[in-house]
C-alpha cells in the first residue's frame, strides 16, 4: 500500500474513532512495519488507541472496534490491528514491553493535549535505566537487568 492510501486509511480510522469514542479518545499511534517503513504486501496496520472508559477485560476491549476493523478488511483488504489501552494503563512504575516495541518506530496520528508526547518525556529516564533489549529468538522485549 502506498503512503497516500495509508494516510487516507489512517484519517478515516481516526474519524471513525472520534465518532465512536467522542471526548474519551486521547491518542492514536501508528507503530510496527508501516511506521518503520518495512511493511510488505500483507502487513497489518498496528495502532495503539488510547481512550478513557474502555472495558476492563482485554477481550471486551477487542470487541469495541471490531465493526470498524471488519469494515476496513472488506472495503480495503487491509487488516487494522488496534490495541486499546486507557491512560492509566501506561504506568510510570513499570514499562509495558509493548511500549519498547512502539519506540522502535511510531507515528502520531492523533494526540489530544500532547498526552503521548508528554508520556514519552516522562518515561525516557525509565527506559534509559531499565535498558530494554529485544530477544530475537523469542520475539519480545526483556529488561536487561532481569535476564
Swiss-Prot record:
Q: What Gene Ontology molecular function terms does this protein carry?
A: ATP binding; metal ion binding; nucleotidyltransferase activity
Q: What reaction does this catalyse?
A: L-tyrosyl-[protein] + ATP = O-(5'-adenylyl)-L-tyrosyl-[protein] + diphosphate; O-(5'-adenylyl)-L-tyrosyl-[protein] + ATP = O-[5'-(adenylyl-(5'->3')-adenylyl)]-L-tyrosyl-[protein] + diphosphate
For this protein, the record's InterPro entries field holds: NT_sf, Polymerase_NTP_transf_dom, Type_VII_TA_antitoxin
From the record, which residues define motif GSX(10)DXD motif? 32-46
Tell me the cofactors it needs: Mg(2+)
Origin: domain of life: Archaea
Q: Which CDD domains match?
A: NT_KNTase_like
Enzyme Commission no: 2.7.7.108
Asked if Nucleotide-binding is a keyword of the record, the answer is yes
Give the cofactor binding note.
Binds 2 Mg(2+) ions.
Question: Quick one: which residues bind Mg(2+) 1?
Answer: 44, 46
Q: Which residues bind Mg(2+) 2?
A: 44, 46
Q: Which UniProt keywords apply?
A: ATP-binding, Magnesium, Metal-binding, Nucleotide-binding, Nucleotidyltransferase, Toxin-antitoxin system, Transferase
Q: Relate the protein's function as given in its record.
A: Putative antitoxin component of a putative type VII toxin-antitoxin (TA) system. Its cognate toxin might be MJ1304, which it might AMPylate.
Family stated for the protein in its record: Belongs to the MntA antitoxin family.
What's the protein called, per UniProt?
Answer: Putative protein adenylyltransferase MJ1305
Biological classification of the source: Archaea, Methanobacteriati, Methanobacteriota, Methanomada group, Methanococci
